[in-house]
Amino acid sequence: SVTINKIIVVNNGSTDGTKEWLDGQSELHVIHQENVGGSGGFYRGIQEASQMDCDWIWCMDDDVFPSENCLETLLAFADKDEKIGIACPHRLMSGKTFTGEAKTLNLSNPFKDMHDNALMATDVESNEVTDIVGMAFEGPLIKKDVVEKIGLPNKELFILYDDTDYSYRAILAGYRVVVVRDALMDKY
């Protein structure tokens, strides 16, 4: 598969021995911080990565595991179209397609879920690439140009809709956000 230049781990206030274990991993670039929510962790990790010499930033949460060729597959599709700013993996839970993304958003009613047109398993399974509006921070490959153009995730959102906000901002900036069917990632 593809060689990864650097792995950045943001330890978001773990108290279960994670800090000590991470401190013993010399091949990792580890950042320890207080728990500032998922959005604060992604904010810090993307901030750190965007200051490095890279073209793409691959984000993951602690409950997802990419298949061996996931990154290679994401890159292959992302490099085919310069408009792709974020390429997301096809997530599986217990061997079945897991979706939480949205194909459209409804921002007209603050009392309803903004994910108006949910991505269905059949959408992902029947198309090589599916355009989405709302993504999850569970494996997206983000073009560094996107970060330079739209900035960092909104850390004030703490744990909810930070990823949807980020992907929507990328789309408003003219990028495509897609799910790549053959880029597999397990979610636990």
Give residue ranges: language-model regions.
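Short beta-strand-to-loop acidic/aromatic patch adjacent to the donor-nucleotide binding site
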Residues: C54-D63
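A short, conserved alpha-helix in the catalytic core of glycosyltransferases
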Residues: P140, V146-G151, E156-A183
